[in-house]
């Protein structure tokens, strides 16, 4: 069976994690069809008909997000394809043609009400607890056509049946029945020739051969309109599956007020795309073997649409950070982490040499960071002598100042600076002074790193190197 899926984001702002989430499942269904030897196609089209909210750079950023995630579409405005154009703003003539076909068939009508008239009609309908009744619905079609031909401004509205019900079949739910009397006559084509979401969505999905409409559950209430349109055109309906919405911890719909929703924020923070995909895959779905860490290929191997659960999945930033840390420590090799961290730092305009010193610092920090943006925050003392000294570290330096000059001399005279040598020397130094080792090592750490928290002392000494360590201890001893 052919599987043709799509996502249709609107270029109205930041590329949203919700687009990535829905894109993952649509991409996966198409890939699974290919793996079975069937046709599988994933389409990305741009729904840019809301010109009031259009943001010029947003489309490029959507493509950038999809490329970062590795969810490459088979057809899109970028690479084209047999079903183009893929921007709705370039398809207005198509929508006008199909809207007029519905008028000719008696499934839609021209409506001439002014905004003021519509406001009054809506108020009356609200007071009476019913959907709006549009007078133009009862106009003689020939009279309506004459007015349009004369240049009068009109929209085209769907003529929803007055009686009966429209049933939505959803692959994740029991059939949902909507009473037709509670569905208003939606505008399909605006007076300026631009379509509404409902018409453009259905026409595009049909003409592009979409077989599966996988989208967020917020579109369920729009689906009876789409079902009525499919029936009015005489077209077969696709399979609908409405995915659970991503939620904040309080179960409210995810929003940037409570969680970063722009994928660009996660990119800038240094999250890995593999971890983001892994995390999004667990939103409403559980690996059949209980695995928490798995790659995209594994997800495509075991995912089944019918296994999606509908309880609102919580988008936990803490869980995503934990998962990203697992990738750094357990999935990627040290070499891969170093290479990708260096590329990330370069993208953030931090020019560090990719040398043995850099890689030694990376090796120490892998257990101590969850995302790449933490790397420089936690390692300023590796890259500059002008590193910050915390208040606690300053206090520790003051405590150790009586013995720091002698400690500097002892470290300076060591024949080597490997961990075994420095550990033995520091423990001997503490014992000679009748101190516990920590009473020596804590001021030393504060002096060479400006913090009371750092990687293991002896590894830290080796990576910083004897010359740098001695100079810093001498400076701290002088009170500098």
UniProtKB/Swiss-Prot annotation:
It is found in: Cytoplasm. It is an enzyme of class 6 (ligase). Its main location: cytoplasm. A motif ('HIGH' region) lies at residues 9-19. Belongs to the class-I aminoacyl-tRNA synthetase family. Glutamate--tRNA ligase type 1 subfamily. Its EC number is 6.1.1.17. It catalyses: tRNA(Glu) + L-glutamate + ATP = L-glutamyl-tRNA(Glu) + AMP + diphosphate. InterPro entries: aa-tRNA-synth_I_cd-bd (IPR045462), aa-tRNA-synth_I_codon-bd_sub2 (IPR020751), aa-tRNA-synth_I_CS (IPR001412), aa_tRNA-synth_I_cd-bd_sf (IPR008925), Glu-tRNA-ligase_bac/mito (IPR004527), Glu-tRNA-synth_I_codon-bd_sub1 (IPR020752), Glu/Gln-tRNA-synth (IPR000924), Glu/Gln-tRNA-synth_Ib_cat-dom (IPR020058). GO terms for molecular function: ATP binding; glutamate-tRNA ligase activity; tRNA binding; zinc ion binding. The gene is gltX. Catalyzes the attachment of glutamate to tRNA(Glu) in a two-step reaction: glutamate is first activated by ATP to form Glu-AMP and then transferred to the acceptor end of tRNA(Glu). SUPFAM superfamilies: An anticodon-binding domain of class I aminoacyl-tRNA synthetases, Nucleotidylyl transferase. Keywords: Aminoacyl-tRNA synthetase, ATP-binding, Cytoplasm, Ligase, Nucleotide-binding, Protein biosynthesis. Monomer. One of its GO terms (cellular component) is cytosol. This is Glutamate--tRNA ligase. ATP binds at residue 256. HAMAP family: Glu_tRNA_synth_type1. GO terms for biological process: glutamyl-tRNA aminoacylation. NCBIfam families: gltX_bact. A motif ('KMSKS' region) lies at residues 253-257.
